[in-house]
Structure formats: C-alpha cells, structure tokens
Amino acid sequence: MNTIANTIKQRLSLREPLAEALDVLTRLVDKLSLSKPERQSDKEAEAVAYEVYLKEQLQRVKEVCPYCKDFERDFPSFAFSIATGIGKTRLMGACIAYLYLAKGIRHFFILAPNLTLYEKLMRDFGDPSYEKYVFKGISEFVHNEPLIITGDNYNKARNLFSDNQIQISIFNISKFNTESKEGGKKGAPKMRRLSEYLGQSYFDYLFSLDDLVILMDEAHRYHADASKKAINELRPILGLEMTATPTDEKGKSFKNIVYEYNLAQALADGKYVKIPTIAKRRNFSRGNMTDEELDILKIEDAVSVHEHTKLHLEMYAKNNNQP
C-alpha cells in the first residue's frame, strides 16, 4: 500500500479513474531512475549513451505496462488518455503532489495549448482561494506554497534558486516555441534569450535542472514537428501527457499510453459525464426516406429545437432584466 498516494487521493477527493491513474504513475516512477545520464564532452558518445538509457528505461516501464511500446519523445514520457470532464487538471495536481512528496522533485513545467487554457491553468495552480485550486487539502503546500512562474513573469521571477520551494512553470505553447518578431525581423523565442537576472535564458535554466518534469495539457497538440522538437530539447527526466484524444496529427494512436478511461467507459459508468439528449420525433417512422433525406430531417429538427430554446432564453432575459 502506498501511503502517500492514498493520502493524496483522500485529500483531493480523486474520482476513481483519477485514483487508478495515480496508482499507475506510482508504480512507473518506482521503476524509473528519474535522473539524466551524465553529460559528456564527446557529443556522439553522449547521444549513444542517451539512446541506451532510453531503451533501458522503456524496458523497466514494460514490466508495469507491457502495452507501452515507445516513449515517442527523447525522454521517458507517459500518456494518460482520460475523457473530457473527468478531471485531467486535478490529476496533474495529484501527480505533482506525489512526485514532490514521494520523490522530492521540485521543478515542474506545464504546457498549455492556447491562451484560454493557459489562463485557466494559472488560476487552477496559482490561486489558493479559488474553489477549483488543485492543491486544496495538501497541507504541505499551505506552509510551502508553490512558486508559480508563468510566460508573463518568468523574466522577473524571484527565489528560483530556493533549496526547498516547489516551482511550477506554466507556459502557453506559442510563447515556448514561436519565433518572436520585433522590428519586422524574426528572432528566437523570448524565453530562449539571455536574462540579466538569471545570467542565462529561461529555457537554458530549465534545461539545466536535474529534476524537471514536464506536463502537457491536451498532449495531442504537441506531436507536430516544431512543438515536439522544442519539448525534446528541454530533456526533462519525465513527461506526463494528458489528453482525451490520444492520436497524433496523422491519426495514429499514441504508443506511450499507460492508462485509459475513455468517453465510452465514462458514459457506461454514468457517474462523471452527462449523457447527451438527442431531439427526436415521437412515434417517428422512417418509411421510404433515403439516408440523405433522413440527415436533412435531423438537421431541421435540431435547428427547430435551437430556435425554440433561443426564444425561451430571450423571454427569460426580458422578464428578468437580464442582458
């Protein structure tokens, strides 16, 4: 029994699928070295050593998850395929809490695929007063609150070199790998430029960390060549990929899935997601209608329901002085 994992499950009130996913993570990280191979002056020798390291780590993983065929990145990386609405963000919080409390890992880098999710993640991880704060109940984070570093404040970040504070960097993928344009000229992304405060770029700072873990929200967005290359260059000790769509841009399934709880399972369980209601006619008989005619009828019915609902909402707004 893993006491730390069980405590996190209870404190965060994890749903059953999320608790199962956390259990998988605990077994996997016990198998991994969670360290980078030593750097070598001979780059060719270093590349060979790193390839051997990855193969060895994959073999260890297969002892727990034989269906994990490949990391798909230049570092150990696991995909959690979990249906939308189950709580992938909460699982990320649970994973961070476990890796910190059980393994002493202090540096985490979270990637968001767009501005909307970036802003949501900043609040989920950085606002203890927020009702959906992901670490609510983790007492260790009350006395040692995580330092949240974002794509907006990383150049002004303080306490980066604290010996015991957990650091969570949250970046929108566009700031992470998109070339900047100043004066009409393309240049390196700002996070790759020299920071006077750090004495190096923030990217180089992350690369230099011996315990960096990267978490990818909507991970299917980061399998394109540019994103994948930029992430690989960070060389973290571990990657955790969260997605409800575990396929790449070519439609191929991920080879590094270690846990799956898909929409079909969620609908069958009937506990966590709403079952969609489909508008249909009472006592409807298809008769001699063709497939095309039937599709048109379905669309017309859907439009009718939409207009009916819209009318009721407008009436409600007028009657209650709402915009």
Predicted regions: what they are:
Residues 81-82, 86, 93-119:
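Conserved SF1/SF2 helicase motif Ia
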Residues 150-230:
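Conserved RecA-like ASCE ATPase "motif II neighborhood" in helicase/translocase motors
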Residues 104-136, 142-143, 174-175:
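Conserved Walker A/P-loop ATP-binding site and its immediately adjacent core
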